[in-house]
Curated annotation (Swiss-Prot):
This is Potassium-transporting ATPase KdpC subunit. Belongs to the KdpC family. It comes from Caulobacter sp. (strain K31). Part of the high-affinity ATP-driven potassium transport (or Kdp) system, which catalyzes the hydrolysis of ATP coupled with the electrogenic transport of potassium into the cytoplasm. This subunit acts as a catalytic chaperone that increases the ATP-binding affinity of the ATP-hydrolyzing subunit KdpB by the formation of a transient KdpB/KdpC/ATP ternary complex. The chain crosses the membrane at residues 7-27. InterPro entries: KdpC (IPR003820).
């Protein structure tokens, strides 16, 4: 009977070591060597080395001198542990009321301007760190006014941070909210704050 169990035990032990230890270590090693920033969460640090965010996860920016991310289905604080879509269909009364309230507030701030869809709709995860270039341009006048800048200065930062579709055809053009806001702080500190 032991002769029948021995191959099974050896196979289980071998595959445990191979797939539970060797393979994960190899993948981690390759990732750390080839893509260290991405392998460690695409973290963004300030001048002192303190982590201030990640380019992969949205965070709340409510002040007028900053671009604002998309609304979050994960709560007001963009809580990653609550990440998910709202599962509300397009005819859901709660969703319609929230989007109308958000659109009315944006319309009051920007009369006569077309509101981009992603300014009032959540992403699938609720934590999308990027907005459309149209949404960034929509917010640029508010940011410029709050920082005492010309609109062209803010637009130049947005254009400099804009990314096209992956490989030229996958996805949509996008702007990372955190990187634009960090660049604005570095180049044009708002109301006496230190850049960086």
């Amino acid at each position: 009977m032991l002769s029948h169990l021995r191959p099974a035990i050896v196979s289980a032990g071998l595959f445990t070591v191979l797939l539970g230890l060797a393979y994960p270590l190899a993948v981690t090693g390759v990732a750390q060597a080839a893509f260290p920033a991405q392998a460690n969460g695409s973290l963004v640090k300030d001048a002192k080395g303190t982590v201030v965010g990640s380019t992969l996860i949205a965070q709340a920016f409510a002040k007028p001198e900053y671009l604002h991310p998309r609304p979050s289905a994960a709560g007001a604080g963009y809580d990653a542990s609550a990440s998910s879509g709202s599962n509300m269909g397009p005819l859901n009364d709660t969703l319609i009321k929230r989007e109308k309230t958000d659109a009315d507030a944006l319309r009051a701030e920007n009369p006569g301007v077309v509101i981009p869809a992603d300014a009032v709709t959540t992403s699938g995860s609720g934590l999308d760190p990027e907005i459309s270039p149209a949404n960034a341009r929509f917010q640029a006048p508010r940011v410029a006014k709050a920082r005492g800048l010309r609109l062209a200065q803010v637009q130049a930062v947005i254009d400099g941070q804009a990314q096209g579709p992956l490989l030229g055809f996958i996805g949509q053009p996008r702007v990372n909210v955190l990187t634009v806001n960090r660049t604005l702080d570095a180049r044009f500190p708002a109301h006496g704050q230190k850049g960086g």
